[in-house]
Amino acid sequence: MIEADRLIHAEPQGPEERDEQIDRAMRPKLLDEYTGQDDTRAQLKIFIKAAQNRGEALDHMLIYGPPGLGKTTLAMIVANEMGVNIKSTSGPVLEKAGDLAALLTNLEPGDVLFIDEIHRLSSVVEEILYPAMEDYQLDIMIGEGPAARSIKLDLPPFTLIGATTRAGALTSPLRARFGIPLRLEFYNTKDLSSIVSRSANVLELPIDDEGAIELAKRSRGTPRIANRLLRRVRDFAEVKHDGEINKAVADLALDMLDIDSEGFDYMDRKLLLAIIDKFMGGPVGLDNLAAAIGEERETIEDVLEPFLIQQGFIQRTPRGRIATDRAYRHFDIIQPEK
């Protein structure tokens, strides 16, 4: 199965999710509308208020964590709270130093520059970013060969917000230049059910509390997945029932979509069962595991594993991956004695 084809894949997916009007409506605009991530929200309120009181641009910010948790949304909220414009791009798009220079020179004082997948910046672009972040200056080379010379352009004070799913992949010099590091965690069921209810309200979709909770339980702690499942369950409710989503309707729809009580799909179960059946519960190395299930090691490491580890189904040890007691219980398999 291709990772991007999964219904519970946390990256943006499909033409429906590219519908900007719906996407904008479902996103919170201000911190008071933002659900979950309580510590992060509390910190941001203080940092934003302090910057506003001093009349300064907010310090540069690095937002990291698994995909689908709201890094882009949070960047937009920061710009809204500061009352400034936001310009968005991504690391792979900025191929040349001139690409970044064009963005920086068009910023107004206090503006936010948001770079998604910042860990994928090229080294050439990254070198340009250092003086821009530290001194609000841009070093430009004029001419070629022996006649080449460097000139400095002053930039207005701005806030760089970088987002990444792989904070460890950032170079140390770049990471050190972010004054505000923020890690986003998987959402609990209570917060996620509130997000589901809010999104259903935006879509004018009737849903009761138990239906929202059932959707939240199977959404892997990820708002993007919760909103995607909500749309699919809506289709089921409109065709098979009277359009209203309750626990029974959500159960039937999600079972039909092959998403179990823990939010696992075929790929998750394949990974866990490979460790249990093919490697006797582990430990198993990442390369062997990738070969056994026919996936790239990066897909396992960055996409499948984080939620399974966080929920206690897999342990990552120096010797390899191990299936936990909880994994055996999930499949009603008796764990062998070792």
UniProtKB/Swiss-Prot annotation:
Residues 4-187 are annotated as: Large ATPase domain (RuvB-L). DNA binds at residues 297, 316, 321. GO terms for biological process: DNA recombination; DNA repair. GO terms for cellular component: cytoplasm; Holliday junction resolvase complex. Residues 1-22 are annotated as: Disordered. It comes from the Bacteria. Residues 188-258 are annotated as: Small ATPAse domain (RuvB-S). Its EC number is 3.6.4.-. One of its GO terms (molecular function) is four-way junction DNA binding. The RuvA-RuvB-RuvC complex processes Holliday junction (HJ) DNA during genetic recombination and DNA repair, while the RuvA-RuvB complex plays an important role in the rescue of blocked DNA replication forks via replication fork reversal (RFR). RuvA specifically binds to HJ cruciform DNA, conferring on it an open structure. The RuvB hexamer acts as an ATP-dependent pump, pulling dsDNA into and through the RuvAB complex. RuvB forms 2 homohexamers on either side of HJ DNA bound by 1 or 2 RuvA tetramers; 4 subunits per hexamer contact DNA at a time. This is Holliday junction branch migration complex subunit RuvB. The lineage of its organism: Bacteria, Pseudomonadati, Pseudomonadota, Gammaproteobacteria, Alteromonadales.
